[in-house]
């Protein structure tokens, strides 16, 4: 298996900086809704088109940043930067990554419970992410449930793997210190989800995704991320 092509150091810095800036923009856009939810309680069910559109924006931005970093050879360079192999290779890696993500959801759930137990004495009452809360609400219409599931399992993982693994981790790793790149990008990824109780499991998940992306490319890390999110969607629907 051919690993992703390393970005030149100067492009690595630019790609990492652009991805970090975009991640901060996304987090700042979602912060008001999280604060409103914490003070006013859950809002009504979202519009399905709004959910899909909101998930598509980071994906388009990630592809734009990756295409910019891959210049002057947009398609061959983009494949190399993202770590995309041939169709057969991707078709084989996707299901392997998916089942790895499903399996990883078990220890990650344990880390979440551990973090929650440590935070409870400090007065932290972790709120579920808005998407999880909507999935667990029996009043959420089926169309909204389907849109949230599609965004959570396909669109969001693909966007985040491009932004945080290929661009941020890959860009930082191009400076020659992949371990530091994995730690920094994983901490950034976990923090931007704006959930104190989820920082520990998401940090561990991100480290796993960095390792998968560095060794096998985008198909493996995206498959694992999709599998992890699919397990969370299934659990949320089970308890709805």
Spans of features found by a protein language model:
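N-terminal, membrane-interfacial amphipathic/helix-forming hydrophobic leader that caps
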Residues: 1-109, 113-114, 218, 230-240
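N-terminal start-of-chain detector that recognizes signal peptides
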Residues: 39-41, 52-55, 126-129, 160-161, ...
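Membrane interface segments of multi-pass transport proteins and intramembrane proteases
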Residues: 40-43, 119-126, 171-179
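A generic short-segment signal for beta-strand/edge and adjacent turn/coil regions
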Residues: 48-51, 122, 140, 190-191
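A generic structural signal for ordered alpha-helices
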Residues: 56-60, 89-96, 128, 146, ...
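Hydrophobic alpha-helical segments embedded in or immediately adjacent to the lipid bilayer
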Residues: 99, 103-123, 150, 159, ...
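Transmembrane helix-loop-helix hairpins at the membrane interface
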Residues: 106, 133-240
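Membrane-interface interhelical connector segments
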Residues: 116-142
């Amino acid at each position: 298996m051919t690993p992703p092509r390393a970005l030149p150091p100067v492009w690595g810095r630019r790609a990492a900086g652009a991805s970090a800036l975009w991640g901060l923009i996304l987090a700042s856009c979602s912060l008001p809704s999280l604060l409103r939810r914490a003070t006013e309680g859950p809002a009504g069910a979202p519009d399905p088109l709004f959910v899909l559109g909101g998930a598509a924006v980071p994906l388009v931005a990630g592809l734009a940043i990756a295409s910019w970093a891959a210049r002057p050879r947009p398609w061959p360079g983009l494949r190399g930067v993202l770590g995309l192999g041939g169709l057969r290779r991707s078709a084989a890696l996707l299901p392997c990554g998916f089942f790895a993500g499903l399996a990883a959801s078990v220890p990650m759930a344990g880390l979440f419970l551990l973090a929650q137990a440590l935070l409870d004495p400090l007065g932290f009452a972790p709120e579920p992410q808005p998407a999880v809360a909507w999935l667990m609400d029996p009043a959420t219409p089926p169309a909204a449930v389907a849109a949230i599931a599609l965004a959570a399992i396909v669109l969001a993982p693909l966007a985040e793997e491009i932004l945080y693994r290929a661009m941020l981790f890959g860009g930082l790793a191009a400076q020659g210190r992949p371990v530091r790149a994995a730690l920094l990008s994983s901490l950034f990824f976990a923090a931007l989800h704006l959930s104190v109780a989820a920082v520990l499991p998401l940090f561990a998940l991100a480290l796993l995704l960095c390792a998968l992306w560095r060794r096998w490319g985008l198909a493996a890390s995206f498959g694992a991320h999709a599998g992890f999110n699919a397990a969370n969607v299934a659990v949320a629907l089970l308890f709805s």
